[in-house]
Design a protein with these regions (language model features):
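Short catalytic/metal-binding and nucleic-acid-binding patches
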Residues: 1-169
Length: 169
């Protein structure tokens, strides 16, 4: 089956990247995730707009300078993290750290962007990792609060009907 990706110049892309068998290793390896991100941006230029890191998956929105490269960005990120994770392990615990593919969605407009931003930031609550959005430290939520785009209590006293049943994983 041929999978066709949509490429919109100067576009934003929502991504979901999941560990193989949903092994919960990501939040215990934030330093390695940061190293992997820093390795990737040396080769592929993109802005990281928003993110949420959960133990077994990552949601993010990126804006690649060259839109056609977002698949290469994901591949490079997975490779870098896997390489760094396995360094020093005599017998790597997991032969494959990531699911083969990733979920991607091209953001269509401002409303679509807002829905995906809300989904990203509410996701740790949805999965039971935090009681409120502000309690989860592995996301870009506070960056958006600082810019005045979210109230600090967003998600705990806000109607979230538009995102509660969404599943972008």
């Amino acid at each position: 089956m041929n999978y066709r990706r949509v490429f919109i110049k100067n576009g934003l892309v929502f991504l979901t990247i999941v560990t193989n068998d949903r092994i919960p290793i990501l939040t215990d390896n934030i330093k390695l995730l940061n190293q992997s991100y820093n390795n990737v941006i040396k080769y592929y230029k993109f802005d990281l707009i928003a993110y949420s890191i959960l133990p077994e998956h990552i949601h993010c929105i990126i804006k690649p300078i060259i839109i056609e490269e977002y698949s290469k960005i994901v591949k490079s990120f997975k490779y870098s993290f896997t390489k760094n994770y396995n360094v020093g392990l005599v017998n790597p615990t997991y032969k494959r750290l990531w699911q083969n593919r990733f979920w991607e969605h091209t953001i269509r407009d401002e409303n679509d962007l807002n829905i995906h931003l809300n989904y990203i930031h509410y996701n740790p609550v949805k999965h039971g990792y935090a009681k409120s959005v502000k309690d989860w430290e592995y996301s870009s939520f506070y960056k958006f609060v600082k810019k005045g785009l979210y109230d600090i209590n967003w998600g705990s006293n806000t109607d979230i009907k538009e995102i509660i049943d969404l599943d972008f994983e």
